[in-house]
Amino acid sequence: MTKLEVCCYSVDCAITAAQSGADRIELCAGQREGGLTPSYGALRSAREKVAIPVHPIVRPRGGDFCYSTMELAAIKYDIEQIREMGFPGVVVGVLNEEGHIDLPKMREIMAVAQGMAVTFHRAFDMCLNPYVALEQLTDLGVSRILSSGQQQTAENGLRLLRELTQASRGPIIMAGSGVRLTNLHKFQQAGIRELHSSAGQWTSSPMRYRKIGVSMCSETELDEFSQYCVDGDVVAAMKRAVSPDREMQYVS
């Protein structure tokens, strides 16, 4: 059975995704930076309000995945807190200066995350050699790898995703980036059984008064009066599309 993980940037979105049939939530902050560690308040609210599994991302900043000693300490503290709050899994990833999995740092992270399902996020798509990385992450005990097949979209990276799925001795290969209702069948036909999607759209802020000429961000071209929200109808449609009955159509 294909599982659908929905990337959510708020607890409201996580509730919508769960009610619409998602199998799991990746909870993030910082949509415009590709996902950052959610706040304690968001984590606590998610634990109280979302019934399906929630895996928070732990990423202290945007940009690359090569972290300092202090950043690693922050990652470990966050994972410790997330584990103590009862979350079943966590999403994380660390590379070294040469583009390889940072094994010493990842070993420290895995020790702190003991007992949790660890997803190695799309830092995987920035690594030098995905086949070596797959073996290293297998040995580390990582549960799954979120990947676009080292391309801008998972559809473009489908060949590598298929090869990794066939080669994996352990971690589930979960396709993410540009996964949508219109291309789900391509991943199913490739034998990929976990899919990751934001399943949403940009929505306008409810603010009626909008101050002109003042921005809270140095990138003044960004529209601060819009936010990306999960669309429950899209989640429900995607879940129907990956249901067992539909899957039989792709293999028959």
Curated annotation (Swiss-Prot):
Domain of life assignment:
Bacteria
Tell me where it mainly resides: cytoplasm
Keywords in alphabetical order: Cytoplasm
Q: Name one Pfam family in it.
A: CutC
One of the entry's Gene Ontology molecular-function terms is: copper ion binding
Where does it localize? Cytoplasm
Which Gene Ontology CC terms are recorded?
cytoplasm
Q: Provide the family line.
A: Belongs to the CutC family.
The name of this protein is PF03932 family protein CutC
Which species is the source of this protein? Pectobacterium carotovorum subsp. carotovorum (strain PC1)
